[in-house]
Amino acid sequence: MELKSLGTEHKAAVHTAAHNPVGHGVALQQGSSSSSPQNAAASLAAEGKNRGKMPRIHQPSTAADGISAAHQQKKSFSLRGCLGTKKFSRSAPQGQPGTTHSKGATLRDLLARDDGETQHEAAAPDAARLTRSGGVKRRNMDDMAGRPMVKGGSGEDKVPTQQKRHQLNNFGQMRQTMLSKMAHPASANAGDRLQHSPPHIPGSHHEIKEEPVGSTSKATTAHADRVEIAQEDDDSEFQQLHQQRLARERENPPQPPKLGVATPISARFQPKLTAVAESVLEGTDTTQSPLKPQSMLKGSGAGVTPLAVTLDKGKLQLAPDNPPALNTLLKQTLGKDTQHYLAHHASSDGSQHLLLDNKGHLFDIKSTATSYSVLHNSHPGEIKGKLAQAGTGSVSVDGKSGKISLGSGTQSHNKTMLSQPGEAHRSLLTGIWQHPAGAARPQGESIRLHDDKIHILHPELGVWQSADKDTHSQLSRQADGKLYALKDNRTLQNLSDNKSSEKLVDKIKSYSVDQRGQVAILTDTPGRHKMSIMPSLDASPESHISLSLHFADAHQGLLHGKSELEAQSVAISHGRLVVADSEGKLFSAAIPKQGDGNELKMKAMPQHALDEHFGHDHQISGFFHDDHGQLNALVKNNFRQQHACPLGNDHQFHPGWNLTDALVIDNQLGLHHTNPEPHEILDMGHLGSLALQEGKLHYFDQLTKGWTGAESDCKQLKKGLDGAAYLLKDGEVKRLNINQSTSSIKHGTENVFSLPHVRNKPEPGDALQGLNKDDKAQAMAVIGVNKYLALTEKGDIRSFQIKPGTQQLERPAQTLSREGISGELKDIHVDHKQNLYALTHEGEVFHQPREAWQNGAESSSWHKLALPQSESKLKSLDMSHEHKPIATFEDGSQHQLKAGGWHAYAAPERGPLAVGTSGSQTVFNRLMQGVKGKVIPGSGLTVKLSAQTGGMTGAEGRKVSSKFSERIRAYAFNPTMSTPRPIKNAAYATQHGWQGREGLKPLYEMQGALIKQLDAHNVRHNAPQPDLQSKLETLDLGEHGAELLNDMKRFRDELEQSATRSVTVLGQHQGVLKSNGEINSEFKPSPGKALVQSFNVNRSGQDLSKSLQQAVHATPPSAESKLQSMLGHFVSAGVDMSHQKGEIPLGRQRDPNDKTALTKSRLILDTVTIGELHELADKAKLVSDHKPDADQIKQLRQQFDTLREKRYESNPVKHYTDMGFTHNKALEANYDAVKAFINAFKKEHHGVNLTTRTVLESQGSAELAKKLKNTLLSLDSGESMSFSRSYGGGVSTVFVPTLSKKVPVPVIPGAGITLDRAYNLSFSRTSGGLNVSFGRDGGVSGNIMVATGHDVMPYMTGKKTSAGNASDWLSAKHKISPDLRIGAAVSGTLQGTLQNSLKFKLTEDELPGFIHGLTHGTLTPAELLQKGIEHQMKQGSKLTFSVDTSANLDLRAGINLNEDGSKPNGVTARVSAGLSASANLAAGSRERSTTSGQFGSTTSASNNRPTFLNGVGAGANLTAALGVAHSSTHEGKPVGIFPAFTSTNVSAALALDNRTSQSISLELKRAEPVTSNDISELTSTLGKHFKDSATTKMLAALKELDDAKPAEQLHILQQHFSAKDVVGDERYEAVRNLKKLVIRQQAADSHSMELGSASHSTTYNNLSRINNDGIVELLHKHFDAALPASSAKRLGEMMNNDPALKDIIKQLQSTPFSSASVSMELKDGLREQTEKAILDGKVGREEVGVLFQDRNNLRVKSVSVSQSVSKSEGFNTPALLLGTSNSAAMSMERNIGTINFKYGQDQNTPRRFTLEGGIAQANPQVASALTDLKKEGLEMKS
C-alpha cells in the first residue's frame, strides 16, 4: 500500500491509518476543520475502533541518502512533514529530474532523518503558522489577509498575492478533508476488534501503519508538489530498531521529577497540532515568521515551559509569559487580596511550586504533560497556630525522601514535616494515569476512563483515543506501580502488563494489589464479607484464599447485630489487610496464609488523628497508594470534602491533602466530539441550545462556548408547546430544567478554589405522571407539563392530562384509536394548534385535529396526509421553531405544512450558538439610562436623583423620554370632545359599585340559581339515604363500566373534600372553628347580628346552616363525613349564617357586603352536586350485577360527563372559587385591574401605552405587542417586568394665625387628605413559564403639619421689617417685595391602603395570544382572568405612619396684584429660587395579607416598630406661584390668613432611603399523596448513603414490589430507617427527606393541610445593614444581653469565618438601586414538631407565627439582593386647595444575587451554600479564561 499526498488548487489530504498486530483497526486520522483543537479532537476520536493505537512507522535501515544508517528521532508527528512543506522547495521545472522521480520521499523517509539533517534544516525556520494558540488566534484563513509575511530564500517571491490567498483557502479545505476522512474512514475493516480479554493498548505510538486514502496523479503543477509515501513490504528492520529502543528504555528508565533535583526535560502534552506552512508554496521559506504563537501548555514536542511564580511582599506575582487563562484563574484564587504568603519554593524545572500562606495553607502548583493542578493541605490549623506565634515561615523539600519541611520563625527551628503530593494524588484529581517504567506499555503513556471506556493519549497530537468498546471501571495505580481496572465489573486487569484475572461470578466491589503483586478482591455479594486473596493476578484458582471477615471484638458484633463485617473497600499493604465498613470505619488483620482457615478476625482501627481534625462523623470511602507505595485513606468529612490521608508509622492515618478544594485543569481533546447538524439543535432561546446525538444529551456551554455531554441513554429530545425541553428516557417523559445556580460551596476557609460560575446544564426533573416504565415509550409529543402524549412499544398512542399544580392525573390516561392508521408507528408530533401527527416506519404521515383526539370522540379516525411530490422517501417529520410540521426527504429537500398545503421550505441559517445580550437585558440597560443615582462608598445606601418641570415628573431621565405633547395628552389634557377622563372614572366607579360588573353577570346569575337549586334539592330529598360512598362500593358495572365506576368514586371524594374545605372556611370566618380547623368551644353567637342583617335588603334571612345540614343529611357523601358533623355543630352552636336572596332587588345583582358570598355558593354547588351524583348512582344500581352492556354504560357515561364537565367543572362559581376568591368585592377589584390594563395598552394616548412604547422604542400597537412578547419571553430566572398606573387627588390647606408679638416666629398649622388608586401588572419568570399578576391598590392618607419661617433679608439690608425692602420700580401701585426666607416644618402622615391582586401562571405558548388580547383589546376582562393556571388571589391591608421634618432657604420676589389696602383678599404673584433639606424622623407600618388558591393559602404579617432616621433628602427649585390670601377677622381683630396658591416649578432632589421592614409568611397547603417518583428518588438517595447489606437488600426487594402502592412502600422505608442511627450530614439529610414524605402522606390520608413555606424576612434598603445592626438593635442588646443574635449579627459572624462569603456579600452591597432581603426559617427539629402538631390539629397559623418571634428557633435561610430600575412619567396639578396627580411607570427588577444556605445536623452553622442570579455568573475574566482553555482543548473541573 502507498499513502500519497497530492497538493492541488482545490484539495489535499493526508490519511494515516492505525495498524493492529492482531487484527485490522481503524485508521488514525489527522487534520483539522478549523483552528480549534477540539474540532481536531472530535475527528480523531470519532470512532472507537483501535483509537488507542499509536502510529507504527516503518523506518528503513538507511537514511535518505542511501548510505548512512537511519536514526530514530524523538520528534513530534508533524503535519508539515507529511505535506512535505519543510524539506522540499517550490516545484522545479518539469524537465528537471527531481520532479519526475517515480517514487519520491516516503513518510518513513520524512520521519527518519538523522540529527545532522535535522540540524541542517534548523537554519530554515518555520513558515508563518496557522495556530490556535494563545499568542495568535484566528477564526479563519481570512484573518491572514493583509498581514505581512516574511519569506525566505535568496530570490524574490514571484507568486502573486491572489494566488497565495487562493492557496490558503485550499489549505483550509485540505484540513477539513483530512479530518472528514479521519472521522469517517472508508476501510472495510473499520469495525474489527481484538478478541483478547484484556484490551490491547499499543505498545508504542509507532505502531500505526500508513494506508492510502486515494489515487495518485502523475501530473504536477506549478504550485503543488506530488509526494508519494510508500510502504515497504518488509518491516523486519524496523522491528529490530524498535526492540532495541525498548531494551534501552528498560535498562535506563527515566525517573519521575522530584523537587529540588535537576529534572531532565520530559515529553509534554502540547494542545495543538504541529504548526504547518500556510501554503504548500512556502515550504522553502528561510526567514522566521514574525508570528510566534503561544500554546496553553508550552513546549514543542519534548520541551516544557514552566510557570513563572514569585512573591512580592507576600503577594503572588505571575509572569506575563504564563498562559493568560491560567494567570487569570490563579489571580482569582491564589491571588486574592486576602491571600498573604510567607514562603515560596520551586522545583528546578519550574513545573512545581509550593506556597505557604499565613493561614497555614500549603499550596502545591503542578504542571504536567496533561494537566495543571493546584491543591492544598488538609488541616492548616496546627500550622496556622505556629505561624501566628512566629510571624514568618519557610518551605523546603528533602531531595531524598521528598518530604516537605515547613518552618516557622526566623530560625525555622519549629518544623512540620508533610508528604508532598505526587502523581497519584493528581491522578485522583484528573482521572489521568501514566504507565510506569518496566511495563509492557510505554513508560509515561497517559490513560483515563471516559464514558466507562479506556482512552489513550496520542503523545504527539495530544488527543484522547478510545482503546476499545469494553466497559471498564475503577482505574487506579496500585502499590506495585502498575495500572489496574475492572472490565465489566467482574474481571481485574493489569493494564500495564496486559494481564487479567479470571472472570468472577459476582461483581467486584473493591480490590487492592500490594508491592509484591498480591491481590485482594472484595466481591459485591449480599453479605459483603466474602473476599479472596490471590498470590498474583494470574495465579491458579487453587492458590486463592477465600476469606470471611468477622469482628475480632464480640462487642462490635453485638453493636452491629451480627458477627460478620460488611466491607465496602479494601486495601493490602505490608502483609496486612485493611478494610472500611459500611459506616466508613476501619478494621485490619494480618493476611492469612494458605490453610490458616477461612474466617478472618478483623480488629477495629480507631483513628484518633482523623477524629481530631475531621470530627467523629468522618467516613473512609476508599484507599490508594501514593508514588512511594505508601497507603493512603480517602477520608470524606462532613463538609462533603475528600482528603488524601497517608498512613503513618503509628498505624494512624493523618490529614494530608484536600482533594475537593482544588483547581484542576486537564486536557480533554478527543473526549467530546459533538458537532450536531442545524436541524438536530434545539434552540432554547436565552437558556442556550440542546442536542441529542447517539442517545446522549448535549448542551452548548455558554461559558466555554463548546458542546458538553449531560445525560446518556436518552430516547428523544423535543420542545413542548410551552417552550420547555422534554426528554424521553427509561420509558419516562421528563422536563429538562436548565441549571441556574452554582454547585455547592463549602462554608468556611476551605473554599479557596471556589470560582462561582453557572453552567447552563440541563437536568431532568421528575417524570411526568401517568406513563408507566413498563409501557416502554418510544416517542412523545408534549403540549406542556400538564398534557402530553406517548407512543408505547406496542404501538399505542396514549394521552395524559395532569391536574395543574399537582402530581395527580386529572383524567385517566386515554388510549387513542388506531382506526385509519396502516403500518408500524415510528414517531408522533403536535403542531402549534395541537393537531396530532403520526409517522410510520414506511414514511407515511397520519393526522387528527385537536378536537378529535382531545375529546376522545369514538367516531374520530386518523386521516392519511398527502405528502408533497418527491422521488425520494420521507426521512423524518419534525417541527419548526414555530411548531409547524416540516417534512424532510432523503434527497435533502424540505417542505413545510401551512395553510393546509405543503410548501418548499428552506431552513434558516443557524445563528451563533452563544447567547448574546437578551432582550430583557437590553430593556433593563435602557431603563438604567433613565435613572440617576450612585452608591455612597462604604454605606450601602443609594442616592437617587429626581426632577420635574412644570408639574411633569420624570424629568431626570431625559435619555428615555417621550415627547412633551404626548405626555400632555396622556397625563394632563386630551383635546377631544369626549367626556373628560376623571368624570368618566367617577361615573363608572359609582355604577360598578352599585350593580357590579357586566362581565361577571353569569356569576351573579349562577349564585342566585344555586340558592333555588338547594331549595329544590331539599324538597326532592326529604328522607335520609345510604351514604354515597357505600352505594358506589356496592356497584358492579362489569368490565365495561369499571372505568366509569372509578371515575364516580374519584369525583365523590373530590366533592366531599371540596365541601369540607368550604365549610371550614365559613366556620373560621364565623368564629365557630379555630384556625387549625378544630371546634371552638368558646364560641358564642353575636346577639345583634340578626338585627344588623335585617337591614340588608340583599340577604334572604334564611339559615344557610340548617338548609345545608338538611341536604347533607338526606344525601350524605360518606358514612363518617366530616362535612355532616361540622354542619351539625353549626346548627347546634347557633351559627346564624344567612345567604343572599335568589333575586337581588334594585338591580344590585349580588350582596356586596357578604365577605363569604362565593364560598357559600361553592358549598351549595358541592352539596347539590353530591345529591345529583346520588341520583346517578341509583340509576347505575339498576344495571349493577347484571353485566351491563356497552350501550348501557355509554348512557351512564354521558350522564356522568354532563354532570361533572358541564354542570360542575364549567360552573363559574367553581372557576372563581378555585382562584381563591371568597366574595364578590375582591373579584370585582381584580376585574377592574384587568380592564384598566386592557384600556391602558390598547389606547395609544394612554400613559401606560406611551411609557411602554418609549422604553421599548416601538411605534403602534402591533410593534408594541411584538416587542413586549419577545422581551417577556427572554426574561431570565429572577427577572421581572412591571407596569403601573396611578392617580389621585386631595385637598390641603394651611392657616397663618395672627400671634402675639412676643412669639418671635410665625406658627403655621396645616392639614390635608388625599385619595389615591394604583393599578399594577407584572410578569416574572418562573419554572415552566411566566407568572402574571394584576393588582389594584386603593388608599387614603391624611397629614397634619406645623411650619414656621423668618425673613432674614432685613438683617442684611438694615431695614426694620420686610416691608422696608419693598420696591416700586415696576409700579407704584404694585410693589415688588423681595425676601430671603428660612423655613422649617414638621409633619405627620397616616396612610391606609387596601390591596387586591390576582396571580397566575402562563406557559410560553399562551403568552402571544395573551399579549395580543391585552394590547388590542380582543379579550374581555373575564376571558383574561380565565387564562393560565394555578390562580391565586391576594387581599390585604397596610397601615403606615411617618413623622418628617424639612427645612428650606428661599430667595423670593413677590408682587402684590391688587390695590393697596384692599381687604380682605390679597392676590400675589411670586417667583423664588431655593434649597431644601428633609429627613424622616420616625416611621412604622403594619401589614396583613392573605393569598388563597385552589391548593392552599398563605398569610403574611408585618409589624414594623417605629424606626428612626429612615431617610434624608436635599433639593433645589425654581418656582413661580400665584395665589390669594384671605384675611380673617373676629370682632374687628385679625385672626389669621388663609392662603391658597397654585404654582409651577423646576426642581431636582436627591434622596436616600434607609428603611427596614420585616414580615412573617406562613403557607398551609393541601397535602398530596406520595407518588412513585417520590419513592424512586428517595430510595436512590437512601441507597447512596446507607450501604449496609440490610438496607441494600431491603431497597432491592422494594423495587420488586410492583403491586405495592407508594404509601405502602413508604411505610416499609419508615419502619426500616426508624431504628437507624444517623451519623453524618448526608445521612441526616436523606432520613430527613424520608420523614417529610411520611408526614406528607399522613396529611394526605387524613385530608389535612401541611406546612409549606414558612419564613421570616427582613428587607433592607441600606445594604450595609445586612451584616451590621442598627442603632435600635444595639441599644436593645445593650440593655438585654440575653437577646438572641439578630440575622445581621449571624451573617456578620458567617462572613468573618468565610472570606469567600464575605467577598460575595461585599460585592452585592456595592450595587446601586438595590435592596436586600434576609430570610430566616425554622430549624429542622422545631419544624418537624410543628408539622406533626398541625397534623394532629394542635396548632394553627397563630401558634406557628409565635415561633418566629424567638430567633433562637430560627436559622438564616438565604440572602437576596435585587436591583430595580423604573421609568416614570406623570403630571401633578396643584390648584389652589385641590391637587391631582396622574402617572404611569414601567420598571424591571433582576436578581443580582441570592445566597442559599444548606444545613446539616448543626442547625446554627451552615455547611455549604449555593449562589443564584447575577453573582452566580462567572466574572468576565474567569469566563474568558474558561473559553480560552476550551479552545486549547483544556477544561477546568467544576
Swiss-Prot record:
Instruction: Cite the residue spans of the region called Disordered.
Output: 1-72, 86-163, 182-264, 281-300, 398-418, 1480-1505
Family according to the record: Belongs to the AvrE family.
What is the protein name stated in its UniProt record? Type III effector DspE
Q: Kindly give any further remark recorded in the entry.
A: The P.syringae pv. tomato avrE locus in trans restores pathogenicity to dspE mutants, although restored strains are low in virulence.
Q: What does this protein do?
A: Major virulence factor that may function as a water- and solute-permeable channel dedicated to creating osmotic/water potential perturbation and a water- and nutrient-rich apoplast in which bacteria multiply within the infected plant tissues. Expression in Xenopus oocytes results in inward and outward currents, permeability to water and osmolarity-dependent oocyte swelling and bursting.
Q: Name one GO cellular component term.
A: extracellular region
* Location of this chain's protein in the cell: Secreted; Host cell
- Give the chief site where it resides: secreted
Give the activity regulation note.
Polyamidoamine dendrimers inhibit channel and virulence activities.
Assembly and partners are described as: Interacts with the chaperone DspF (DspB/F).
Q: What is the induction note for this entry?
A: Transcription of the dsp region is positively regulated by the alternative sigma factor HrpL.
Basic and acidic residues bias: where? 1-12, 110-120
Q: Which InterPro entries match?
A: AvrE_T3Es
User: Could you give the domain comment from the record?
Assistant: Secretion and translocation signals are located in the N-terminal region. The N-terminal region is required for interaction with the chaperone DspF. There are probably one or more DspF-binding motifs or domains near the C-terminus of DspE. Folds into a beta-barrel structure that resembles bacterial porins.
Q: Where is the composition biased (Polar residues)?
A: 91-103, 407-418
Q: Which UniProt keywords are listed? A: Secreted, Virulence
Renumbered to this chain, the Low complexity biased-composition regions fall at: 27-46, 1480-1502
The keyword Secreted is annotated on this UniProt entry? yes
Q: What happens when the gene is disrupted?
A: Disruption mutant cannot cause fire blight. Mutant is severely impaired in its ability to induce electrolyte leakage in apple and tobacco leaves. Transposon insertion reduces the ability of strain Ea321, but not of strain Ea273, to elicit the hypersensitive response (HR) in tobacco. Mutant induces fewer necrotic symptoms on A.thaliana leaves than wild-type strain. It is unable to multiply in A.thaliana leaves and bacterial numbers decrease rapidly after inoculation.
The keyword Secreted is annotated on this UniProt entry: yes
